[in-house]
Amino acid sequence: MRVKTFPSPQAALAGALAWLMENLLYASCGVLAGGETPLPVYRALARQGVRYPGVLLLSDERWLEPGDPGTNLYRVGQALGPLRERLLPFPLGLSPEQARDWMEERIRPFLPFDFALLGLGEEGHTASLFPGSPALGSSRLVEVAVGPTYPSLRLTLTPKALSGTRLVLFLALGPAKRQAILRVARGEDLPPNRIRAEEKWIFTDQEV
């Protein structure tokens, strides 16, 4: 795991945008994080008018009603603009177990992924893979998981699905993330270190 520190959050977001645009040029399938942190990157990507013929996956999804503004699909889709048409969403109209099985079969042909832009939580989670979660050791590609905040029920890509990805970038901004960055960079047994990729980076605005 390599860490690149930028002088400001804006500079780190610009770095993530450049990384993402470069990878979209050559990728057939990539993974995007939900949550607040990467949304400015997606909005900037939409403003660039980038055309991408491949498939985009969400790293995880919150178990809410389809179309709920709290879903990652809604928020990431709004930010991506026209590129939202490239998203392959989790099917929230099914049961969690049916959605897990459906998604697993759909993503299997795209393995290994070309890139993954992921987040990093204060306690070291990424996607909906939280420390101690049974999903970390799952032999499946997609799992039903439980998070600490509402909605607690989630669907998430597993380390098995994400391992083998060519390039993985964790975007972690703000002083609240500093300890998690340090722990991941030291190689502690946290979810980001369960993902085996050809190249892994953390982009941050924190000195570590």
Predicted feature residues:
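C-terminal functional extensions of proteins
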Residues: 162-208
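Ligand-binding beta-strand-loop-alpha-helix segment within the catalytic cores
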Residues: 51-117
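Glycine-rich N-terminal segment of FAD-binding domains in flavoprotein oxidoreductases
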Residues: 22, 26-47
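A glycine- and small-aliphatic-rich helix-loop capping segment at beta-alpha/alpha-beta transitions
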Residues: 44-52, 77, 131-139
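Class I SAM-dependent methyltransferase SAM-binding "motif I" and its flanking Rossmann-like core
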Residues: 115-118, 122-160
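Short, conserved loop/helix-junction motifs that constitute active-site signature segments
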Residues: 48-55, 135, 160-166, 194-198
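N-terminal glycine-/serine-/threonine-rich phosphate-binding loop
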Residues: 1-30
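Glycine-rich beta-strand-to-loop/alpha-helix junction loops that act as flexible
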Residues: 31-37, 118-122, 173
